[in-house]
């Protein structure tokens, strides 16, 4: 669920998804195209790919179980879809934390029209 993903991002990075990640680069936020701009954008690209494999799941709106304890995100039990969505979100939030040192404010509201290089495939 998008609100749960936001909480994971905040837990890992201490930044709110909006405005820091919702419009970042070529892949963060709704949709994505061309090539990721940097490590942060690549986290979003991989997250999009992860969701893309879950074609039978309601990736943006399914509510799943998880906990935030002792510096770790742990996904809980649920349906196969809910567990997989949680894992996609957990991995992406942890990736965003690892990419904090290279986060660029210039990509924060990056116009998708400037994403020109050839697309990558998952």
UniProtKB/Swiss-Prot annotation:
Active site: residue positions: 47, 89
pH dependence per the entry: Optimum pH is 8.5.
Protein family (similarity comment): Belongs to the phospholipase A2 family. Group II subfamily. D49 sub-subfamily.
Organism of origin: Crotalus durissus terrificus
Protein name in UniProt: Basic phospholipase A2 F15
Known EC number: 3.1.1.4
Reactions mediated catalytically: a 1,2-diacyl-sn-glycero-3-phosphocholine + H2O = a 1-acyl-sn-glycero-3-phosphocholine + a fatty acid + H(+)
Regulation: Activated by heparin. Inhibited by its chaperone crotapotin.
Function noted in UniProt: Snake venom phospholipase A2 (PLA2) that shows moderate neurotoxic activity in isolated mouse phrenic nerve diaphragm but shows high neurotoxic activity in a chick biventer cervis preparation. Also shows a high bactericidal effect against both Gram-negative and Gram-positive bacteria. PLA2 catalyzes the calcium-dependent hydrolysis of the 2-acyl groups in 3-sn-phosphoglycerides.
Pfam families noted in UniProt: Phospholip_A2_1
Keyword line: Antibiotic, Antimicrobial, Calcium, Disulfide bond, Hydrolase, Lipid degradation, Lipid metabolism, Metal-binding, Neurotoxin, Secreted, Toxin
């Amino acid at each position: 669920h998008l609100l749960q993903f936001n909480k994971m991002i905040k837990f890992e990075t201490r930044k709110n998804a909006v405005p820091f990640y919702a419009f970042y680069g070529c892949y963060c936020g709704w949709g994505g195209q061309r090539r990721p701009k940097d490590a942060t954008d690549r986290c979003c690209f991989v997250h999009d790919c992860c969701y893309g494999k879950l074609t039978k799941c309601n990736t943006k709106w399914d509510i799943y179980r998880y906990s935030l304890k002792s510096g770790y995100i742990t996904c809980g039990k649920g349906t196969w879809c809910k567990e997989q969505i949680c894992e996609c979100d957990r991995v992406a939030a942890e990736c965003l934390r690892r990419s904090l040192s290279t986060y660029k404010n210039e990509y924060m509201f990056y116009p998708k029209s400037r994403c020109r290089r050839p697309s990558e495939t998952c």
